Amino acid sequence: MLFSQISNFPDGSRCVELATHLMKLLVHKLRAENMSVEKLQGMASMVTSLAMLFDVLHTAVKFESLHMLTALLSQKESPLHGALRSMPSTIWESHIRGGIIDVLQNRVVSSEKLQALLLAECMMSILGENWLSEDHTVLNNKNVISVDKFVLLVLESARVEVAVLLNEIAFSKYESSKSSQTDDAISQKQRNLAILFSLIERIIKMISDASSGEGEPSQTIQERTIMQAITGLNETISLVLDFLQDAKDHGQRKGDDLLAAVRIVGSYLAETPYACQEKTGRLLEFIFSIEGEDESRPFYSVRFMLPMLSQITTTADGCRTLVSFGGHKAVIDCLINMTKQNGTMIDNGSMFLACDTIINIMSKRKSSHIPMEPYFICLLQALITWAGTTDASSVIMTASSLCTMVMELTSEEFVLSCSDFDSKTLRSLSDLIVRSLHQVRFFYTMNMFLTLDGFA
């Protein structure tokens, strides 16, 4: 009941302050897990009230509301997200949009702008990337600006903060004798950087959807805005690559901040594989060596680059670039490890990208000079394992095609002479190829039937 009455309190009144303090106490106590539907609806009402305060007030309560909103909405996989998505009214979304505009457009300390950008990331996480470019307005809201200006405002604000953080983190890591920052301060900057990277990744996805015509009908973003956004993203990715170059120059290849940098580079190059081509080509071998804090060997750094690799290897030059430093071995190793993820389902999307990359290289192996080596035996076993987890024709045919290409490099006698490959594995390989041929025959028969049926 309190939340529904807040909108009736006079702006800046003592009642608003007291209500806000009460909500602050609740926010730090409440957890949405295992809540009843009624209580979740109450939390959703709290979010609605906080969104209104965040939008319309210009006192300290505005920023308290911002902090409470980010605390509530940043909880991962919270049932509250579902309750908010099912709300019939979108006014709360527009209030949050208005509050974000107000914070980003005015002279506000960097920490509050970071909170506003975190809130934007939370909204895109809960409601989808297209939230940023949907045309929502609230009557009598002076903070309303066009969708295009809002998209660019959020992106440019994020870009500025990323540039500052990259510089500060690099200085604290590589100029430690001149830096007075504590480890906690550096860790906080790295966490903030990860949040901003996540926001920019979502913007990349939104821009990609809008430019390809796959966005929601409510998107009204203009082509000129898309081009401005792409120009800005190019500049930011170039800065991220410079950050990675600094790490390479200082012999640093382990760290979650470096892995996060690789991830955002991979996300952008998935959409524009030849952007920043010179810097990327120079750094690709180093990127493949980067490890997260909890990794004992590189894995995710290669996996994040697979969408780009599957595209550049369609050309002979791209294949030569990858093979020149043994990058194809890293891709094969990544594929093998994806089939060994204990307790988790195999990510078919990443597997297809890895297979496409290897198939592209194998197709151009005469120009790439790829000899038969033991790691190909491990690749065969991984493909057999992958195909054995499903009846999906796409998996069976892709795995079979790549196995066949590998076998063209060698002979049955050589394969059986390898200690890790026995007659049982060879039978499994034969069964896979037979399954693939049955799939081809089935599709051929169906195609013939449909063709004849069309002439009937």
Predicted regions: what they are:
Residues S49-L50, G99-D102:
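Blade-edge beta-strand/turn elements of extracellular beta-propeller
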Residues L259-R263, R303, P307, Q311, ...:
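A eukaryote-biased sequence property
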